[in-house]
């Protein structure tokens, strides 16, 4: 079987539970070789984000050139992009190198609700990046921000917003329903072929730091092994559920701790 080379384009987390660090752990846990391009140095921990230092867009582009000119990249995950010029740099390089299997975790809001992208960056993201992306993975607040619409409060509203996002030009949409008041935590996959509902019981743990990063990285790592997104989503969600179920065995920080990426080994 061909070895999978996976790239993450994202910000950092020195506490190890989210961002680049979580992505690389996820790639390794799922049998993919991980490469990384850093878009922002983030001072954060299990209690929140303290500060963000944005990498110069030219240097983000230089990192992308270094990887794409030398390494066969089979699959890519995009996370925090921080500003308009970084969105533009990433979109341009994806187009230049004809990169396939791109999963975009639409990191747009901090847990506090504060925006992590300016309105101009969101506009560039819609026009330049989304048409090149194979799958986006917004939660409900992120979907609302992308659509400039109210937060979906029901599953029906979630369905309507998922369809609207697909119409914006990306290949597929995985709408995450964790913010709904529903014991099953429904997710919906929207593709050009149809729609599919996924459910999983809520796992009772406070340690959910980096779950969005981890899921999108898992989707990227697993996509080359499947012929469709539905099977990829099913395997990624199952693996993440196991990582969440073992999260309380870790002892990391005094806030919202990380999931256990290496639960299968220790």
Where do the model's predicted regions map?
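Acidic-glycine-rich active-site phosphate/pyrophosphate-binding loop
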Residues: 1-2, 8, 19, 183-198
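Conserved N-terminal subdomain of the carbohydrate kinase-like
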Residues: 2-8, 28-111, 115, 262-265
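Short pre-catalytic strand/loop immediately N-terminal to key active-site residues, enriched for Gly-Thr
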Residues: 9-15, 195-209
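Phosphate-handling active-site elements
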Residues: 30-35, 196, 222-236
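Nucleotide and nucleotide-moiety/phosphate-recognizing core
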Residues: 88-96, 171, 194, 229-231
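Conserved phosphate/ATP/ADP-binding segment of small-molecule kinases
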Residues: 119-195
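Short, small-residue alpha-helix embedded
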Residues: 145, 206-229
